[in-house]
Amino acid sequence: MDEWINYDQFDRQTWHSFFPSEITFLTQENLDEIKSLNDQISLRDVQDIYLPLIKLIQLQYQNYQQMQLQKMTFLRKSSRRIPYIIGIAGSVAVGKSTTARLLQILLKRLMPDRRIEMITTDGFLYPNAELKRRGIMARKGFPESYDMDRLLTFMNDVNAGEDQVTAPTYSHSVYDVMEDHPQTIYKPDILIVEGINVLQLPTTQRLFVSDFFDFSVYVDADASLVEKWYLERFGMLLDTAFQDPTNYYYPYAQGDRAEAFKMAKQVWKDVDLPNLNDYILPTRTRADVILHKTEHHYIDRVYLRED
């Protein structure tokens, strides 16, 4: 069975033609500030790919608001703010964090009267101490390493319109959850949830994170390219962030570079690649939009799920 049977496929030029605006709302300096370390994104990417996507999301959001209003009227209930939730999924190092941050900024520029918030699910990993207690430290990043009950409670509280909801944050420099530095979400109109696991279907819960999504995006690339970007990022970090003595990977930056890369390649082989193949990639066709990348993070195709 063709896995793309439920999708319309567009090349870059065709996708751009749906909203051919030359207004980017951003400068290249803005993009450089939000992109991940080795990601590549340009103003042309914004014009060709992201502005049409943002316009589509705006249309979906307006329809969502209208439907919520009609539903509340039909049920004779007082209206309340129910946030529109967008999920961003994809492998490590594929550029999903850049996509999430870019969508947040563009939505703020397009709808300045709306509160646009973003979280990452990294904060819902179990702390290292708990992973060690459970004997799954080597499985960090796999589905069982996430506190799904806590994540689902967070999503439910946001969806219920709680005045403020807190989410744990994660520090890549210390390689652990930062329980004492929570992120507070204040009744967003739109919430972007970014993470490798947001479209997964865990076997131990009846409710899934994706059940809360009104729209979802999967950032896609061939595994060989993702590995290349992963190792490129690791090399850049060896020369920058890893030079900080407080960084988790500081010993690798001070030791033999070949040994450091040997370790990184082993982590990719033992953790990230199996996680991609077994748990992340199978969720791709659950997304509403798939952004397909080629060399240099160039998006050459966009897949849009048919209604």
From Swiss-Prot:
ATP binds at residues 90-97. The keyword NADP does not apply. The keyword Plastid does not apply. Pathway: Cofactor biosynthesis; coenzyme A biosynthesis; CoA from (R)-pantothenate: step 1/5. Transmembrane segments: none annotated. It is an enzyme of class 2 (transferase). It holds the Pfam family PRK. Its EC number is 2.7.1.33. InterPro entries: P-loop_NTPase, PanK, PRK/URK. It is found in: Cytoplasm. Disulfide bonds: none annotated. It catalyses: (R)-pantothenate + ATP = (R)-4'-phosphopantothenate + ADP + H(+). GO terms for biological process: coenzyme A biosynthetic process. Its main location: cytoplasm. One of its GO terms (molecular function) is ATP binding. Keywords: ATP-binding, Coenzyme A biosynthesis, Cytoplasm, Kinase, Nucleotide-binding, Transferase. One of its GO terms (cellular component) is cytoplasm. This is Pantothenate kinase. It comes from Limosilactobacillus fermentum (strain NBRC 3956 / LMG 18251) (Lactobacillus fermentum).
